[in-house]
C-alpha cells in the first residue's frame, strides 16, 4: 500500500499532465483493477489538476478523498489540490454512486492516518475549473 501511493506521487512529479480526462462511463469496484466487478456509472471528469480530478472521482465513487494517501501526499508535495472547486457541469452529488471498496481499503486508511500531520490541516488553494458530467446529459 505504501509503495503504490508513493509511486503514484513520484510518477506525477516526473510527468505533469496539462489535461486530465477520467472516463467514468464504467468503473470497477471490489478487487479492481483486475479482478473487480464492472459498474456502469456514466460520468466523466476533465481538469488541468490531476490531483483535484482524482479527488472528485473518488468522491463521486462514494469514498472520502481524505482516505486516499496518494492524494494527501501529492497535495503536500505541491502537485495539485486534493479538493475540488469550480465544478462546471452537473452537480457531482447527482452522479455520486457508492462503490464497494477493495479488500485492502482499510489498510490504506490506516496508512493515511499515519501520514496525517499533527495540527490544523492546511487549506488547499483554489483549483482551475473541473469539468464533470454525464455523457448522456444535455447542456
Say what each PLM segment does.
Residues 1-139:
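Extended, low-polarity segments enriched in aliphatic/aromatic residues
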